[in-house]
Amino acid sequence: MAKSTFFVCLNLSLLFSLVTATYYSSLTPTLLGFREEQFTHLHFFFHDVVTGPKPSMVFIAEPNGKAKDALPFGTVVAMDDPLTVGPEQDSKLVGKAQGIYTSISQEEMGLMMVMTMAFTDGDFNGSTISVLGRNMIMSEPVREMAIVGGTGAFRFARGYAQARFYSVDFTKGDAIVEYDVFVNHY
């Protein structure tokens, strides 16, 4: 009797552990209908416009007191910046860079970028790439930020984005930034 009770308890324990362990399953991308992994290089221009009737970035928060820097430590900015094929403002629009950046350094001009590049044209229309990273805009001629995800054509995206100034108007604060994005995706 004790022996059969032991086996019943053991079997119930095993059954219970199997039932509770099924909240996940291991999959491969092909089981989800994804094709072979691809590597894509994107090249476009990011227009960060402070001036004019319709700026593409606005200040959300600024530190107390007067600061001599354009973006003093602690400044938070929201952006909805056009992404274009060429550096000209009227160049073909391929998407928007939407997100926030924060001034993160007390010693030099540095930003923490949190943005989604939302594409509105061509093969990648409706797809996004999520970018996160440190952007030391004055001390590094080419800055590199991580691609941490994506949607649509860029599901499971990973890679990096390189940013370099194409032109900057230090008086107004407007900037055109050239981006090269290297992304692995399915």
Curated annotation (Swiss-Prot):
Write out the catalysed reaction.
Answer: a (4R)-4,2'-dihydroxyisoflavan = a pterocarpan + H2O; (3R,4R)-7,2'-dihydroxy-4'-methoxyisoflavanol = (-)-medicarpin + H2O; (3R,4R)-3-(6-hydroxy-1,3-benzodioxol-5-yl)-3,4-dihydro-2H-chromene-4,7-diol = (-)-maackiain + H2O; (3S,4R)-7,2'-dihydroxy-4'-methoxyisoflavanol = (+)-medicarpin + H2O
Secretion signal span? 1-21
Which compartment or compartments is the protein found in?
Secreted, Extracellular space, Apoplast
Q: Which UniProt keywords apply?
A: Apoplast, Glycoprotein, Lyase, Plant defense, Secreted, Signal
Q: Name one GO cellular component term.
A: apoplast
> Which top EC class applies here?
lyase
- Cite the EC number: 4.2.1.139
| A Gene Ontology biological process term | defense response
Residues that carry a glycan: N125
Q: Specify where it is mainly localized.
A: secreted
User: What protein name is recorded for this chain?
Assistant: Pterocarpan synthase 1
The organism's taxonomy opens as: Eukaryota, Viridiplantae, Streptophyta, Embryophyta, Tracheophyta
